[in-house]
């Protein structure tokens, strides 16, 4: 983003001053109003713990600023609803993480699904987790938890691919009640382990595994199974490593190497700045972010109440823009037929 924006002001704790200045901030403050209300600030980036997301975003939107917001949109549906309404009527754009649908690999997979390459989607799986943060205790306190921090990625990706959810059922637990944060032991007060089942509006079912309990894994980040095929993203949805496509009419798995290995999971900043510059709307909408939050809160509630929870919000399909370039043939590896000569008139397996 060098040359696109200037870092006018940064807000944080006193010990963060030197780092902010070193990274280019022209001034530093510990008072957030000195950023959200500053006349020379056009775009506010909120990177605080979730409990303060809504308050800070509302303050910035009230001042006519554009806002880039860490996930989730808020921890409260009422606050989130106010944010969506402000974004609809105000001059400022609102873009909320996760930004996984911006990746070229995600968008290519979405086009395969929309084009009917795997038939009607019937079921899906998603997974994201790790052993858990050791640098701050808010992850293990109310307003934190593995769903807000990790499950949000899977929910954003699955609903981005398959559309809105209509019902959620979850089992959540505290698997490891004591965590080491820096040099002290912290008691875990929110879920660190979750399994979520989502019934989508289309009738498809999706399962999400997430938690601060996954030491390592090698399975795909996302899997979508349709009536005539399947597609799965390799790596994590925030760091794709290509994808695999099965079509019954092809009779083989086609393996597509990652075509954008340098794509950053922070790409939302670039996207938002481009939208501001060009006068366009982001392809990730506040309505989608609100829906993701409703699913998250429904999963938390379901885990506590041990019953399914209906989801009432919706959103329009994500605008993926024009189709991306066709993958070069040398980037494609068909692991069941790689040594077979192509049939007469056949096209490359990587055509998108």
Give a label for each model feature.
Residues 155-240, 266-280, 299, 314-352:
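Contiguous beta-strand/loop segments that form the cofactor/metal-binding neighborhood of enzyme cores
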Residues 25-86:
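Beta-loop-alpha module in the N-terminal Rossmann-like domain of NAD(P)-dependent dehydrogenases
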Residues 93, 100-187, 306:
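Predominantly a Rossmann-like dinucleotide-binding segment in NAD(P)-dependent oxidoreductases
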Residues 1-23, 347-352:
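N-terminal Rossmann-like dinucleotide-binding module
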Residues 29, 69, 94-96, 125, ...:
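Hydrophobic residues in well-ordered beta-strands that form the structural core
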Residues 6-7, 254-258, 275-292:
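Glycine- and charged-residue-rich phosphate/anionic-cofactor binding loop of Rossmann-like
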Residues 5-7, 41, 121, 165:
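Core-facing hydrophobic residues within beta-strands of well-ordered domains
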């Amino acid at each position: 983003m060098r040359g696109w924006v200037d870092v006018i002001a940064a807000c944080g704790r006193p010990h963060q001053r030197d780092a902010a200045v070193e990274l280019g901030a022209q001034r530093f403050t510990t008072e957030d109003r000195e950023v959200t209300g500053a006349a020379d600030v056009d775009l506010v980036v909120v990177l605080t713990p979730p409990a303060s997301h809504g308050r800070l975003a509302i303050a910035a939107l009230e001042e006519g600023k554009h806002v880039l917001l860490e996930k989730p949109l808020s921890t409260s549906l009422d606050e989130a609803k106010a944010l969506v309404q402000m974004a609809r009527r105000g001059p400022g754009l609102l873009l909320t993480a996760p930004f996984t649908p911006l990746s070229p690999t995600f968008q290519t997979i979405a086009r395969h699904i929309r084009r009917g390459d795997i038939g009607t989607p019937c079921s899906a799986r998603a997974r994201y987790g790790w052993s858990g943060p050791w640098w701050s205790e808010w992850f293990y306190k109310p307003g934190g938890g593995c769903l807000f921090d990790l499950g949000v990625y899977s929910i954003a990706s699955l609903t981005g691919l398959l559309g809105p959810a209509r019902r959620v059922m979850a089992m959540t637990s505290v698997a490891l009640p004591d965590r080491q944060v820096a040099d002290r032991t912290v008691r875990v007060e929110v879920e660190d382990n979750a399994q979520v089942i989502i019934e989508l509006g289309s009738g498809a079912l999706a399962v999400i595994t997430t938690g601060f309990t996954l030491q390592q894994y090698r399975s795909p980040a996302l899997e979508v199974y349709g009536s005539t095929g399947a597609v799965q993203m390799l790596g994590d949805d925030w760091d794709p490593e290509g994808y695999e496509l099965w079509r019954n009419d092809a009779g083989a798995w086609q393996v597509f190497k990652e075509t954008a290995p340098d794509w950053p999971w922070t790409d939302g900043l670039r996207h938002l700045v481009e939208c501001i510059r060009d006068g366009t709307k982001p392809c990730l909408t506040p309505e989608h972010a609100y829906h993701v939050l409703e699913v998250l809160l429904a999963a938390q509630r379901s885990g506590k109440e041990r019953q399914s929870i209906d989801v009432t919000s919706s959103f329009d399909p994500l605008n993926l823009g024009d189709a991306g370039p066709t993958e070069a043939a040398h980037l494609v590896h068909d692991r069941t037929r790689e040594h077979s000569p192509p049939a007469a008139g056949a096209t490359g397996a990587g055509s998108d």
